[in-house]
Amino acid sequence: MAPGRNIQGTFKDLLILNQGTFGNASGQFNYPIPHSNYLSYIQLYIENTNGATSNTGHTIESDISQMRLVIDGDTVWSGEPRMLRKMMHYDIGKYPDANETQVGGAVQWCAVKIPFGQNDFDRDFLLPAHKFKDIQLQIDYAWTDNATTGFASSSSNAKITITAKMLEPTSAPVPTYFLARKQTQNTTFASTLNGTQQDINLPVGAGNGLVRRFMAHVYEAAKQDGVAITNYEVVLNDSVYLVKSTWRASQTEDQNRYNASVLKAVTVVKADGETYASRVGRLLAPISVPSVGDRSLGATVAGDTLTFAYAVANTGVADATADPQYLFLESTGVPYSTMIDFGTENIGNSINVTAPTVTSFKFRPTIGTITSSAEFDLVVEQVMLL
């Protein structure tokens, strides 16, 4: 199925909100999105200021639990910023823009994109904003203020800028297909599940359109990527196997298709013996931390977690001073995630989960080795027509 609308008109960049404050330490941020013409995407820039000494415990991604785009009461986009940014990572092939610094008083920020088309200038897939009475952006947040491990004065320092790319048509508006992304799973796998196969239900039935692709994510700190889930299947109606693969083979396919890789820059404030969970899987090389002044510095790696080792030069005596260290972390693929793709190259290959013959659609992972518990998330991308 292809929409074939090819809407004619002019694309324009729209500033919806500039440096709006969240206003509270926690709650739900609501903001109306213009409901006229067509929208190609909405772009969010969110920032907050670190505590006076440092911020070793919180990031923009960690303190926002959910983002939603609600259209006339229906949620068409939803997810944690970490997961929505992982989808961005696949689309652009690199770690999305962010400043994840732990330095005291510094500004952390990250970008989250909500695209409705296959690219920024897609004239076939657009959100027909003109069709709706109300479009609301909702963000659930709980900023943690702390002088050493959190943010500072978040009620005034936490800010958001909202922009969009809009198509102003030169002909009468018509309904169009658009892409929607929904986080359908946000749970944990316990170690008691090791060696078992789990059934994760994907959406089926009226209102769910076509499933173009979905992304699965599983993470446990200090574990290498591809350990918590070893292999998986995608099954239609409990009998038709659409995909059978291993986690690592699937990630290799992702690299070939999306050219996805990681080069993550981060400034951490750590002392001798302290750790940092980088959330970057299968690091390409050991971390090398340069010497500073009269100190020799280094770090060892276990899975995604770095343990820092500082010593006074020529003495071997541990140096407990916590200084900022600027790190480049590199790996292939999108960390701890894989994309199961049906319709990126041809929308017609997407799975029509509204068909009366479709009664179940499942992601079936085999759990490998989990030490304690691993977070598991799943985001589904659908082709919609409201």
Task: Place the predicted regions along the sequence by residue.
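Beta-strand-centric surfaces of beta-sandwich/beta-rich domains
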Residues: 1-386
